[in-house]
Amino acid sequence: CVNHNHNDSRGKLERRLSSDSLENDRKHKKRKNDYHKHRRPRTSGLRNLGNTCFMNAVLQSLSNIQEFCGYIKQLPSLEDKVLKAKKIHISRKTRDTGEDVLLVEELRKTLVALWQGTKGAISPESLFSVIWKVVPRFRGYQQQDAHEFMRYLLDRLHIELLELLPYPNNNSPYIGPKGKSTIVTAIFGGLLQSEVSCLICRMESKKHDPFLDLSLDIPAQFSSRITKPKDGEPVCTLLDCLASFTELEELEDSELYMCNNCKQRQRSTKKFWIRRLPNVLCLHLKRFRWSMFCRLKVETFVEFPVKGLDMNTYVLNNLHETRGNFSGSNVYDLAAVIVHHGSGAGSGHYTAYATHEGQWYHFNDSTVTACDAETVMRCKAYILFYVRREIRLPDSLCVRTQSSLNGRHHLSRHLSV
């Protein structure tokens, strides 16, 4: 005879085992997803030394610009006594304290320590003390503007590298203010063309100015908006800010143009073009403005793309001075974002988002956490770093050995791009 009770028990056991197996699979997948969600990158956080979040946010952003960070990290150590004369020369030339300090050396050590990933957070105290010495305006522990700090940092690095790495590259298209290129100008350097046209005789004047970043106004029709617009309401986008920057404008009466043809000041129009785009396009949204005796913050949410920022509309073709239409060469992807939290220019807090190997991370001083692109897109960006999909670096910008710094030009390793 058939034992129905036995068969029923076996069936229940099989169903329970099957259910347990599915539950275990579900838990395993959840643990795997949680691991990827909360995994730490190889980079470490940066301790806040007392209102130094502005510096930490800039450093974490730059550390995730692969070509820039890789170059600085692979520079030879400048601690060798042979280089002492050059260090003193730079200090005297820039009217520093006279101490043998180099910002590029401390930045190199900081970036190397960041990417060792052996500590949850490292202290940037040595770098900050050098910054105090070479850029006195950042002395003390007051909150500073991240954009101003970034500009001073890059300018100083450019000056030091010009003195330390005197390799011939005057024919490079990435020329800095002094007619020579460094990794700073090769990565961040672009060229603006301003066109001023007299409204009386139509004579046009053109001027070219190098830039390391572009400061964009938030259009007036959006500047009073604080929260993200509801469905159906117009949204301020990064393209709106770029369009405002490059649109034709008539100069005010207080800015009358001295026309060489009319021989007097005349009403005129002005327009900006980007004549040459940088490899890393740094866009600064002007969130602080003066009102009476204080700086107010513009809280407008600005929508920005994470992938595929097409800059062809705003750039001139160098050969024909027409709008560029290069397929893909002027398309950028987001690499990092700096965010200011708070209402005042001299207060609040800075954090940064940056992507590494396809994963986004949030850098909040000592704390580094994984996040998704949607989280990044919801932030109120202050500074955006976009990397060109097709990086173009001159062959002369390569990492050199110690002998190169001492005068013998031996190439040790080209940057991999």
Where are these predicted regions, by residue range?
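Carboxylate-rich, divalent-cation-coordinating active-site regions
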Residues: 53, 198, 283
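Residue-level signal for mature regions of secreted extracellular proteins and peptides
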Residues: 46, 191-194, 252-255
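Hydrophobic alpha-helical scaffolding
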Residues: 48, 58, 97, 117, ...
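Active-site nucleophilic cysteine motif
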Residues: 46-61, 142-152, 346-349, 384
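Conserved aromatic-histidine-acidic binding/catalytic patches
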Residues: 41, 45-46, 50, 56, ...
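Active-site nucleophile-adjacent alpha helix/oxyanion-hole segment immediately C-terminal to the catalytic cysteine
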Residues: 38-82, 154-157, 161
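Exposed substrate/partner-binding surface patches
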Residues: 1-37, 41, 75, 85-89, ...
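Papain-like cysteine protease catalytic cores
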Residues: 30, 71-210
